[in-house]
Each structure stands twice: as structure tokens, then as C-alpha cells.
């Protein structure tokens, strides 16, 4: 098979192509895997969309559903997408508020990859007639990405979308 990556470069990628992987429904950040960025000199965004996120309300135990949007500018590492999918599924029985889930996801990805810039946005379906859409971001300290994060949070959602009850 043709590959632009060597076996050495792929040795940390263990979940992709592994058909015997079991889904975990308890929060587990150790599922996350990364691989090397072949283009660290380039600034580029990677956007990952996960429309089937579920977690539990920490008070009532009722399920919460959301679409999660992750955008990041990689530095030396990228997140492997199957591990990200399994990681996000691991929130299934996690009791946390929407805002907590989004911040936990961002912090876990920062620990994994140390990206130049990252933002995570959750668009949760309404409960009690209110939809909650938390957003968080982070730019690497002492770089232009720190400034970008400050600007993005200041200007976040200045042109809100029409809400149609999703």
C-alpha cells in the first residue's frame, strides 16, 4: 500500500483500522492519540465536526445532545480522528454541564497536541426551551495565536445565527 507516512511515524496510531476496538462510555482522555505534523512551518486550520455528542446533566442524569466543532492550528502534532471519535463517545455517561464538557475537551486536546491555536464550540439541543452553545479557545502563550485567541473571544458570535430549535 502506498503511504506518505513511515511505520515509525504511525507507531502511535493504534486505533485506526483496528476493528476490535471497544467503545468506552466512561470519560477517558487516555484514548486520544496523535501523530506528527509534516507541515509545522505552515499555519493551517484543521476543523473537526462531531454532530452526535452526548453527555449527561450532572443534576438530573438526563441526556444532553450536541454538535461539537473543534478547529485548531497544529504545531508539531495532530489528533488522530478515530481516537477523537472514541474519546468524544466516552462522554456518554459523563455528568457535566455543557460549559464544562467544552472546556474539558479543549484542555485535553491542548495536553495531547499543544496546538498553536484551538477553539471548541458546542451547540447543544434545547432543554427547557433554551439551547446552550458554549465556546472556548486558547492561543499559545507569547505568540500571535495568543492575540488571535483574545480577539476571537471578544468578537465571538457578534452575528448570531437564527435559532430554529435545531
Curated annotation (Swiss-Prot):
The keyword Metal-binding does not apply. Gene3D superfamilies: 3.30.1130.10. SUPFAM superfamilies: Tetrahydrobiopterin biosynthesis enzymes-like. Substrate binds at residues 79-81, 98-99. Its EC number is 1.7.1.13. One of its GO terms (molecular function) is preQ1 synthase activity. It is found in: Cytoplasm. The keyword Disulfide bond does not apply. Pfam families: QueF. One of its GO terms (biological process) is tRNA modification. This is NADPH-dependent 7-cyano-7-deazaguanine reductase. It comes from Alkaliphilus metalliredigens (strain QYMF). The lineage of its organism: Bacteria, Bacillati, Bacillota, Clostridia, Peptostreptococcales.
Amino acid at each position: 500500500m502506498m503511504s506518505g507516512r513511515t511505520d515509525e511515524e504511525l507507531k502511535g496510531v493504534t486505533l485506526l483500522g483496528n476493528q476490535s476496538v471497544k467503545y468506552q462510555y466512561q470519560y477517558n482522555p487516555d484514548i486520544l492519540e496523535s501523530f506528527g505534523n509534516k507541515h509545522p512551518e505552515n499555519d493551517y486550520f484543521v476543523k473537526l465536526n462531531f454532530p452526535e455528542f452526548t453527555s449527561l446533566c450532572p443534576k438530573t442524569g438526563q441526556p444532553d445532545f450536541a454538535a461539537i466543532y473543534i478547529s485548531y492550528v497544529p504545531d508539531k502534532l495532530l489528533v488522530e480522528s478515530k481516537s477523537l471519535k472514541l474519546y468524544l463517545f466516552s462522554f456518554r455517561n459523563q455528568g457535566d454541564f455543557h460549559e464544562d464538557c467544552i472546556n474539558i475537551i479543549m484542555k485535553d486536546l491542548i495536553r495531547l497536541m499543544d496546538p498553536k491555536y484551538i477553539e471548541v464550540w458546542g451547540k447543544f439541543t434545547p432543554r427547557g426551551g433554551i439551547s446552550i452553545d458554549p465556546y472556548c479557545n486558547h492561543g499559545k502563550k507569547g505568540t500571535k495565536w495568543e492575540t488571535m485567541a483574545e480577539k476571537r473571544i471578544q468578537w465571538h458570535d457578534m452575528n448570531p445565527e437564527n435559532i430554529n430549535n435545531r
